Curated annotation (Swiss-Prot):
Catalyzed reaction equations: GTP + ATP = 2',3'-cGAMP + 2 diphosphate; GTP + ATP = pppGp(2'-5')A + diphosphate; pppGp(2'-5')A = 2',3'-cGAMP + diphosphate
Organism: Frankliniella occidentalis (Western flower thrips)
Binding site residues for Mg(2+): 85, 87, 212
Protein's name in the database: Cyclic GMP-AMP synthase-like receptor
Source species taxonomy: Eukaryota, Metazoa, Ecdysozoa, Arthropoda, Hexapoda
Statement: the UniProt record of this protein carries the keyword Magnesium: yes
C-alpha cells in the first residue's frame, strides 16, 4: 500500500503540509550558512597543514599522495543539523607498472581482491622507490589492512611533531588560531578530532569537528568491475575508488574463504553524486527522513548510506517528474518505500545487489524498525485522513519529525487557517 496515494488530500491539504515541512527544513534540518562558512574555513586550514606535515614526515606518503577528494553527506548537501563531520579521501597512487594487467576478483558482496602479480615482477626488478614489499602477499594481492595501518601511522607521526597536551592530544596553531587535535580509528578512516579555540571570535556555536581521512586508490572506467552495475554513461567523472574498509568475520561471505585482509570495498562517490543531483525534492525529502531517523531510531539501525540507497533505488523506478510533486506527497511516498524495504529485511547496495545494507542487523532489530515505521505511517494516515476540521491534526507529520521542544516551537510560530484549511501563516507577535 502506498500511503501517499491512499490519502484523499486536496491541493490545499498538501499546501498546508508543504508549508510545515518547509518550516521544519529551514529551522531544524538545513545547515546554517554561518556554521558552514565557519567550519569549512577551519576544515581547509587544518587539512592543508596536516597534508604538508604528512608529506614532510613520511617520504612514501610524499611520493604516492596524489590529491584529496571530498566524500560523504556534507559535500552532497545531505548533511543535517551541524556541519561537524567531514569525509575526505586521500587518493594514493601505486607504482605505474602495477596498473598494467591489474586483476579485480569478486569477493564478499561489494568487495574485490586486487591482484598485481604481473606488474609486481617489474616493480621488484626496477627498484621502484614507492614499492613496499609488506603491502603484498606471496601471490601478488594488495593487503588492505597494511594500507590502513600505514595511513594511521603517518597521521600520528605527523601529529607527534606538535606540542603535546595532557589529554593525549596535540596543539596546532594556524594563522593565530589554536587547535587541539587527536585521532581515533573508525572503519577505513583515521578520524582526526579537532577542537577550535574560538576565544576572541564572534562565533558562538559548536567549536568541535572531525575529519574522516580515508586512504583510497583511484581507477579509470576501463578497470570498472564487470560483476556490478555499470557506470552511468553520462557521468562526467567516471573515476572510482577502492578503500580498505575492514570486514567483520560475519560479513566475510566470499567464496573460497578469502581472508578479509585481501578484500577492498568498492566506492563510487563521484557516480552517486551525479545520480542524486538536480532532482528537485529528492534531497529535501531525504534530509527529512534523516531527521525522523535521528528522533526515532539510531544510526546503527538506519544508516545515512542505507537511506541514501533507498532513494537511489527509487529513482530507478520513477521519472524526474516524480520528484517535482508536492514536498509532503513525496515525503509520504518515500516514508512508505522505506517501510517496505525494512519489511523485506533487505536494502541492496546500489552497485552490487548481493550486499544487504541491513545485513549487520539481527532479524529482531529489523522487525523492530519495521514495526515502528508502520506505526508512524498509520498514525500519519489517521491524523490526516479526517475531513472533519476539528479532528484533522495538521501537525501530525511534524510530531513524527520533531522532539517535544521543536514541536512546541513550530506550534507557537505558525498557525493554520482552520476556516478553509489554508496554508500556514506566521503567528503575529506583540512587540
Amino acid at each position: 500500500m502506498s500511503l501517499s496515494r491512499s490519502l484523499d488530500l486536496t491541493q490545499e491539504d498538501y499546501a498546508v503540509q508543504d508549508a510545515i515541512l518547509q518550516y521544519i527544513s529551514s529551522n531544524f534540518v538545513s545547515l546554517k550558512p554561518p556554521d558552514v562558512k565557519f567550519f569549512k574555513r577551519h576544515l581547509e586550514n587544518v587539512t592543508k597543514v596536516l597534508i604538508q606535515m604528512m608529506r614532510k614526515e613520511d617520504n612514501l606518503f610524499n611520493l604516492i599522495f596524489q590529491k584529496e577528494r571530498v566524500a560523504g553527506s556534507f559535500w552532497d548537501k545531505l548533511k543535517i543539523g551541524h556541519p561537524i563531520e567531514f569525509d575526505k579521501n586521500f587518493v594514493l597512487t601505486l607504482p605505474p607498472a602495477l596498473y598494467k594487467n591489474i586483476k579485480f576478483t569478486p569477493a564478499s558482496p561489494s568487495y574485490v581482491t586486487v591482484n598485481v602479480q604481473n606488474g609486481l615482477k617489474i616493480v621488484k626488478s626496477s627498484k621502484c622507490r614507492t614499492y613496499r614489499p609488506d603491502w603484498f602477499d606471496d601471490n601478488g594481492n594488495i593487503l588492505s589492512d597494511k594500507l590502513r595501518f600505514w595511513m594511521e601511522s603517518v597521521v600520528n607521526k605527523a601529529l607527534a611533531t606538535l606540542p603535546p597536551l595532557p589529554n593525549k592530544k596535540y596543539q596546532l596553531e594556524i594563522e593565530g588560531t589554536c587547535y587541539e587535535i587527536g585521532t581515533r580509528k573508525s572503519g577505513p578512516a583515521v578520524t582526526v578530532e579537532v577542537n577550535i579555540d574560538s576565544s576572541g571570535s564572534t562565533y558562538l556555536g559548536i567549536t568541535q569537528f572531525c575529519i574522516d581521512l580515508v586512504p583510497a586508490f583511484e581507477f579509470q572506467t576501463k578497470d570498472w568491475p564487470h560483476h556490478i552495475r555499470q557506470c552511468p554513461a553520462d557521468t562526467q567523472d567516471k573515476t572510482w575508488n577502492l578503500v580498505p574498509k575492514p570486514l567483520k568475520p560475519e560479513e566475510n561471505t566470499a567464496d573460497g574463504n578469502i581472508p578479509a585482509r585481501l578484500q577492498w570495498r568498492l566506492s563510487f562517490h563521484n557516480q552517486e553524486s551525479y545520480i542524486i543531483h538536480n532532482l528537485n525534492h529528492f534531497k529535501a525529502v531525504l534530509k527529512l527522513l534523516k531527521k525522523l531517523r535521528d528522533v526515532k531510531f539510531d544510526q546503527y539501525k538506519m544508516s545515512s548510506y542505507a537511506l541514501k540507497t533507498v532513494f537511489m533505488l527509487e529513482k530507478e523506478r520513477q521519472n524526474n517528474d516524480f520528484w517535482r510533486r508536492p514536498l509532503s506527497s513525496t515525503f509520504l511516498h518515500m516514508l512508505t518505500v522505506l517501510t517496505e524495504w525494512y519489511g523485506k529485511g533487505k536494502i541492496p547496495f546500489y552497485w552490487d545487489k548481493q550486499h544487504n545494507l541491513l545485513g549487520k542487523l539481527s532479524k529482531d532489530q529489523i522487525k523492530q524498525v519495521y514495526c515502528t515505521l508502520q506505526k508512524i505511517n498509520n498514525r500519519i494516515y489517521e491524523g490526516l485522513q479526517s475531513k472533519c476540521e476539528s479532528k484533522c491534526d495538521h501537525f501530525i507529520i511534524a510530531s513524527t519529525l520533531l522532539d517535544s521542544e521543536e514541536l512546541l516551537k513550530i506550534k507557537k510560530d505558525i498557525i493554520v487557517d482552520r476556516s478553509g484549511n489554508k496554508p500556514l501563516a506566521k503567528r503575529q507577535r506583540c512587540s
